[in-house]
């Protein structure tokens, strides 16, 4: 069944009207009166039930569609019930609307009354507005003529004021122009006050621009004159300024700057001047490196002495071109120094001079925040041009590369002299110098490519010499003295070539050090090893002689180079020290095994002292030395004859360089070791009779004689010799005298303590006896211990002795016991 077409449409407006009536009107809310209580307001609204009704709730939606609702109703299967439900809702809404109209009837009447009052007020307002408009028209008509008159008079007054101002400014301009003419017509042009004229010039042009005086005939005539005078002022001021910069005259520079400041052109003029000097610096560098100009001036064209397209001169012209290049470089350095100092002088005056009227610092007008200083601008351009020219010379011209590489010390000397002169000439208290350390390093870095090439060439020359005298291909061949002298002479030449330059000297010394390291490695490869090199029983073999010669060569190199660097600063010694140490170690290696073998031989002879009977009382003692001492003497004499005669320097050359030779040092150490080793084992001899003491004294005398005559002067050995001379009379002292004897001051405490065991009872065992060690084993242990550690071992034996005495119930100790404790306690106190 179809729904009535009119049923959905009235329902929606009815719902909307109902929602409007639910809220009170604004007038009633604003009056503050509570709304009247009606049955409809107290009861629930029909819309509340509609919201929960599945059929009526779609009508409350803002997106309600009648077509969709009708389709849904037809599809539900009960359209009749739906239509009936809608009719009920319409009746309910109509009833609700009637109730609302009835309940709000007084309010509706009040609204109608308000509308009537508003209409009356609006009619009265229209009448008032019409009257006001009529009055305005009458006033406008009355005031139009006076306003026109006022406007006309105002224009006339403004024109008069403008004409008066123009006339006033024109008169002032003409007066300034007359003053400027008076200055320009001064009889002596050199005495014209340029700064005052510049001030007049600036004021005239400023007034003309500011007050638009151009176009006035008399002013235009004066402007022509002012313009001409301005050009003359600029020209004269620039001459004064440049003359002052060249002559470093602060007064002239200040005058020139003041003129341009008064002209209002200070910054542009200074920038232009600095750019000019930058261009001059760049051009100076370019001209100095212009090989075409050099060759044309030193030999001409492509004739003899000319230059080929490759950059290499013809035969016969190289020397002239080289000399011309160096002359141009020297001239370039002079020009660069003058340019930089001139710009610095300009900057110096700018930083000190202030305008006498405004007190403005001129430097602040020229250099704004973030701008670089004038000298920095010129220096940066100079360094850039110099770097470019040097790179071009290195890559484009092999001839120039060779000149600057071979003559790098001269090149760097020129640059450092330039830097030193600039620093010296611009070192003024209270003024920034022209260049700082960073700027100097930039200039030196410009020729870094030639420095690298020069150092490589230096190392290459030295390496070639080293490789030629120590070829790896022919092991066993030794260089001659002439070849060694050639190497030393070449090293000295390399140092002398750069000696005036401390920085370059250190760099060359590092290259020399690399060459010395290479020499030490190659020399070590030539050292012969094996048992034959350590034999000391027969004459020196050819292998040993080769090692001796190699040692002497390396010793000579070490001594000679050490004397070279002695006159250099200490840092030079620090640079070469590790490389000289490598040479020294290489020089020691051929002979150290020989001296060690000889020392072992002499120690084995001395150890035979323990096989002798020094405890016997033999009245028939002969005057001969002990057999072990005779063997030791023969060994020393043989070593002297066969080996030391070849190794030790002659008396004329013994102290040429003021340093001890390697073999002399090894011989001295061996002699000291023999003396100390002997008195150590002599102190361990037990028992020792009076006859044994005499025999031991005889042996010590023979030892002193053998060492002094064949090894090293014993009086130059120091402590070992004093110990030997003290031990000989010590053995003859009474035990009671030893504690106060000054002899023990020249002996190691362990020697005295070991000797006291000889004077003690048998039950007082020495550490060697207690630990059942052989003399050689005990001696090796002593070599690795300090005196306080040796005392600990001795103290343990003394404690054992005291325990034995106390265990027997004895109260008396051997006289040596308290004496040994006294010596040991003093040793302990010294180490605290």
Curated annotation (Swiss-Prot):
List the GO cellular component terms. Golgi membrane; Golgi transport complex; mitochondrion
Q: Which gene encodes it?
A: COG5
Report the Pfam families cross-referenced here: COG5_C, COG5_N
Task: Specify the domain of life of the species encoding this protein.
Answer: Eukaryota
Write out the coiled-coil annotation as residue ranges. Answer: none
UniProt-listed InterPro entries: Cog5 (IPR019465), COG5_helical (IPR048485), COG5_N (IPR049176)
- Complexes and interactors: Homodimer. Component of the conserved oligomeric Golgi complex which is composed of eight different subunits and is required for normal Golgi morphology and localization. Interacts with COG3, COG6, COG7 and COG8.
Region (Disordered) residue ranges read: 1-49
Query: What GO terms describe the biological role, i.e. biological process, of this protein?
Result: intra-Golgi vesicle-mediated transport
Task: Give the membrane topology, semicolon-separated if more than one.
Answer: Peripheral membrane protein
Q: What does this protein do?
A: Required for normal Golgi function.
Name listed for the protein in its UniProt record? Conserved oligomeric Golgi complex subunit 5
Its chief place of residence is Golgi
Keyword NAD carried by entry: no
Keyword Membrane assigned to the entry: answer is: yes
Question: Which family is it part of?
Answer: Belongs to the COG5 family.
Q: Where is the composition biased (Pro residues)?
A: 1-11, 23-38
Q: Where is the composition biased (Low complexity)?
A: 39-49
Keywords noted in UniProt: Golgi apparatus, Membrane
Q: Which GO terms describe its molecular function?
A: protein homodimerization activity
Its annotated compartments are: Golgi apparatus membrane
């Amino acid at each position: 069944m179809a729904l009535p077409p009119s049923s959905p449409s009235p329902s929606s407006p009815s719902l909307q009207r109902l929602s409007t009536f639910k809220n009170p009107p604004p007038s009633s809310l604003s009056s503050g009166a509570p709304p009247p209580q009606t049955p409809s307001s107290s009861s629930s609204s029909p819309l509340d039930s509609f919201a929960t009704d599945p059929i009526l709730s779609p009508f409350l939606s803002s997106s309600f569609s009648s077509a969709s609702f009708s389709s849904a109703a037809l599809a539900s299967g009960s359209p009749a019930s739906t239509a009936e439900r809608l009719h009920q809702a319409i009746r309910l809404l109509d009833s609700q609307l009637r109730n609302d109209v009835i309940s709000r009837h007084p309010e509706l009447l009040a609204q109608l009354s308000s509308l009537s009052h508003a209409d009356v007020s609006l009619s009265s307002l229209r009448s008032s507005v019409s009257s006001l408009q009529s009055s305005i028209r009458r006033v406008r008509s009355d005031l139009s003529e006076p306003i026109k008159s006022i406007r006309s008079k105002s224009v006339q007054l403004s024109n008069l004021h403008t004409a008066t101002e123009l006339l006033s400014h024109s008169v002032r301009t003409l007066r300034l122009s007359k003053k400027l003419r008076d200055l320009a017509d001064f009889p002596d042009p050199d005495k014209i006050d340029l700064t005052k004229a510049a001030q007049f010039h600036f004021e005239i042009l400023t007034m003309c621009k500011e007050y638009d005086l151009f176009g006035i005939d008399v002013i235009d005539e004066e402007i022509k004159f002012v313009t001409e005078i301005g050009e003359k002022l600029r020209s004269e001021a620039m001459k004064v300024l440049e003359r002052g910069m060249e002559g470093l005259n602060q007064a002239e520079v200040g005058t020139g700057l003041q003129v341009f400041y008064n002209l209002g052109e200070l910054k542009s003029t200074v920038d232009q001047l600095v750019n000019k000097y930058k261009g001059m610096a760049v051009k100076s560098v370019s001209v100095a490196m212009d090989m075409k100009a050099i060759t044309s001036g030193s030999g001409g064209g492509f004739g003899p002495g000319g230059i080929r397209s490759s950059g290499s001169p013809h035969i016969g012209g190289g020397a002239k071109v080289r000399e011309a290049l160096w002359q141009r470089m020297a001239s370039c350095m002079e020009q660069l120094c003058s340019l930089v100092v001139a710009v610095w002088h300009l900057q110096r005056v700018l930083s000190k001079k202030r305008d006498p009227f405004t007190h403005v610092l001129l430097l602040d007008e020229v250099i704004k925040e973030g701008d670089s200083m004038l000298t920095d601008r010129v220096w940066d351009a100079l360094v850039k041009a110099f770097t470019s020219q040097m790179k071009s010379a290195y890559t484009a011209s092999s001839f120039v590369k060779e000149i600057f590489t071979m003559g790098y010390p001269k090149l760097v000397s020129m640059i450092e002299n330039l830097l030193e002169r600039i620093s010296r000439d611009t070192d003024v208290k209270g003024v920034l110098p022209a260049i700082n350390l960073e700027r100097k390093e930039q200039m030196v870095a410009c020729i870094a490519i030639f420095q690298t090439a020069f150092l490589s060439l230096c190392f290459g020359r030295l390496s070639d010499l080293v490789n030629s005298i120590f070829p790896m291909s022919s092991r066993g061949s030794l260089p001659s003295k002439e070849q060694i002298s050639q190497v030393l002479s070449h090293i000295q030449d390399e140092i002398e070539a750069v000696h005036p330059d401390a920085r370059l000297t250190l760099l060359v010394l590092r290259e020399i050090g690399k060459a010395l390291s290479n020499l030490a490695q190659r020399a070590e490869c030539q050292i012969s090893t094996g048992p034959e090199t350590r034999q000391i029983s027969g004459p020196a073999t050819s292998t040993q002689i080769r090692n001796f010669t190699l040692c002497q060569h390396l010793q000579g190199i070490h001594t000679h180079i050490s004397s070279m660097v002695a006159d250099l600063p200490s840092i030079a010694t620090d640079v070469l020290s590790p490389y000289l140490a490598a040479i020294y170690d290489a020089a020691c290696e051929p002979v150290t095994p020989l001296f060690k073998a000889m020392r072992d031989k002499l120690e084995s002879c001395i150890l035979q002292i323990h096989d002798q009977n020094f405890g016997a009382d033999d009245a028939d003692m002969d005057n001969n030395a002990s057999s072990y001492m005779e063997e030791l003497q023969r060994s020393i004499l043989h070593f002297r004859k066969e080996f030391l005669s070849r190794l030790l320097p002659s008396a004329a050359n013994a102290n040429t360089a003021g340093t001890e030779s390697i073999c002399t040092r090894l011989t001295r150490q061996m002699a000291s070791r023999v003396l100390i080793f002997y008195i150590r084992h002599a102190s361990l001899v037990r028992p020792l009779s009076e006859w044994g003491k005499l025999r031991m004294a005889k042996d010590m005398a023979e030892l002193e004689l053998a060492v002094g005559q064949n090894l090293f002067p014993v009086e130059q050995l120091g402590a070992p010799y004093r110990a030997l001379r003290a031990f000989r009379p010590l053995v003859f002292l009474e035990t009671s005298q030893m504690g106060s004897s000054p002899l023990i001051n020249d002996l190691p405490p362990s020697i005295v303590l070991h000797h006291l065991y000889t004077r003690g009872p048998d039950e007082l065992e020495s550490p060697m006896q207690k630990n059942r060690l052989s003399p050689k084993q005990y001696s090796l242990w002593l070599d690795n211990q300090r005196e306080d550690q040796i005392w600990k071992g001795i103290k343990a034996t003394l404690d054992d002795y005291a325990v034995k005495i106390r265990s027997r119930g004895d109260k008396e100790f051997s006289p040596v016991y308290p004496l040994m404790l006294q010596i040991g306690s003093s040793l302990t106190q010294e180490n605290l």
